[in-house]
Curated annotation (Swiss-Prot):
Catalyzes the synthesis of activated sulfate. This is Adenylyl-sulfate kinase. It comes from the Bacteria. The active site is at 105 (phosphoserine intermediate). GO terms for biological process: hydrogen sulfide biosynthetic process; sulfate assimilation. The gene is cysC. It comes from Shewanella frigidimarina (strain NCIMB 400). It is an enzyme of class 2 (transferase).
């Protein structure tokens, strides 16, 4: 490693963001399976994309088809999964993008490890706090039913704990309110922290 040095690029993150008219950031959606992380992140990405912002959504299932296809679901593999995702997200933010990620990421240590990759204010933790009972009633993939039968081990919320964030920037319960209202709340937050620069008209809200 002593022979490996960091190569400084002529174009930096600020210049890439300025070209796109935005300040790059990572929004990290965390919560139980079925809480609505991917739905919420996808709806936010759609709203941003439709109004000219440059985004990318990293989804927990999708990365296991390529980047993390060699990993299982042991504690060690889940840690490595999020380590890789964090490094990829860092590269994407450096390219000037507004990056959204939707991962259960059940432990504070895992989430804090990713947060530590970014300067203050560039990692936004969004706790999708939908209650377990609601998530289990939705069970879009049938995973809770399998976990209850013992067919899946180490399943977050059933046989493995989920550590609630202690200092998330945002908390959203998708069982309360409608998706459009929740997305507009996220857009308003991004405007307030100067990610959306300059502000643009989004769905008549002046965001």
């Amino acid at each position: 490693m002593s022979n490996i040095v960091w190569h400084q690029h002529a174009i930096d993150q600020a210049a890439r963001g300025a070209q796109k008219g935005q300040n790059p950031v990572l929004l990290w959606f965390t919560g139980l399976s079925g809480s609505g992380k991917s739905t919420l992140a996808g709806a936010l990405e759609r709203a941003l994309f439709e109004h000219g912002f440059h985004t990318y959504l990293l989804d927990g299932d999708n990365v296991r088809h390529g980047l993390c296809k060699d990993l299982g679901f042991s504690i060690e593999d889940r840690d490595e999964n999020l380590r890789r995702v964090g490094e990829v997200a860092k590269l994407m933010v450096d390219s000037g993008l507004v990056v959204l990620s939707a991962f259960i990421s059940p432990t504070r240590e895992e989430r804090d490890r990713v947060r530590a990759l970014f300067p203050q204010g560039q990692f936004v933790e969004v706790h999708v706090s939908t209650p377990l009972s609601v998530c289990e009633s939705r069970d879009p993939k049938g995973l809770y039913a399998k976990a209850r039968k013992g067919e899946i081990t180490n399943f977050t919320g059933i046989s493995s704990p989920y550590e609630v964030p202690e200092s998330a920037e945002l908390t959203i319960d998708t069982s309360k309110g409608d998706l459009d209202t929740q997305v507009h709340g996220l857009l308003a937050y991004l405007k307030a922290i100067d990610v959306l620069n300059p502000p643009r008209e989004i769905a008549g809200a002046g965001i």
